[in-house]
Amino acid sequence: MNTLKMQRRIAAELLKCGENRVWIDPEKVDEVASAITREDIRRLIKEGVIRKKPIEGQSRYRARIRHEQKKKGRHRGPGSRKGKKTARMGKKELWIKTIRALRRELRKLKEQKKIDRKTYRMLYIRAKGGQFKNKHQLYLFLEEHGLLKK
């Protein structure tokens, strides 16, 4: 078989694409092999012996399936995670989530008259200072110091 390296290169330049995208009619290889000038190649392009292949896009098929799976909670285990814990949820977001839960709980306890105003204020400030990591620790503190009213 003839090597059509030079013809392919010239055709790529004329078609304004890469050499891999140049399609040469396999039945007219000899005709292409005899073409040695740019003008010859231009004529073959006009005749349709040499064509430009379409761009092959990147298929989203697998990506869509993976996205659907992730919606269901698959592929989210520790082995699939990259980066720090804070890369998924920032420190500030985490703090907001925690403090809102604690303040909600304190408000609920105050409304139910399980703690008085002074205790509420003291616990509110301690929560702001980061003394309680979660609601469980808040309740442990309340029980330890006997601050909960029955």
Curated annotation (Swiss-Prot):
Q: Which GO terms describe its biological process?
A: translation
**Key word Aminoacyl-tRNA synthetase present:** no
> Is Ribonucleoprotein found in the keyword set?
yes
The UniProt entry, under SMART domains, shows: Ribosomal_L19e
Question: Which Gene Ontology cellular component terms are annotated?
Answer: cytosolic large ribosomal subunit
Biased region (Basic residues) positions are 61-89
In residue numbers, the region (Disordered) covers 59-89
- Name the protein family: Belongs to the eukaryotic ribosomal protein eL19 family.
Tell me how this protein assembles. Answer: Part of the 50S ribosomal subunit.
The task this protein performs is described as:
Binds to the 23S rRNA.
Q: Which HAMAP family match?
A: Ribosomal_eL19
Q: What name is this protein filed under?
A: Large ribosomal subunit protein eL19
